[in-house]
Amino acid sequence: MAPREPGFAGALPIDGYGPGFFRIAGAVHRGGLLIHAEAAMPWTGFDDLAALRALAGQVDLLLCGMGADIAHLPKGLQVELEALGVMAEPMSTASAARHYNVLLSEGRRVGAALLPMPGAVPTA
């Protein structure tokens, strides 16, 4: 049986990532990223609560990329998002990017809040 390419039905997958950047639909985004099926936008981190609250009704699950390693979400954030109907799962940024693409290809209402990966940021 030949492997099947994932289908995204017009949604925005993460094409690639590296130290300090993400590639979405051929465009490079530097720094943090907030993405769901219909939009990708710069994100400054967990202090930007308005952007996370705006996901209510658009996503059921928010994958939180915490950088190179898994870490706890800021205190109270998970409870606040759950009250809005958004389940939040912290994991490393690399894991969050991969899981986002898999769930998106399944047609799930998923988003990702991704802190950039550490390391030297390419200039070109």
Curated annotation (Swiss-Prot):
InterPro entries: MTH938-like_sf (IPR036748), NDUFAF3/AAMDC (IPR007523). It comes from the Bacteria. SUPFAM superfamilies: MTH938-like. CDD domains: Mth938-like. It holds the Pfam family DUF498. Not required for the biogenesis of c-type cytochromes. This is Uncharacterized protein RCAP_rcc01784. It comes from Rhodobacter capsulatus (strain ATCC BAA-309 / NBRC 16581 / SB1003).
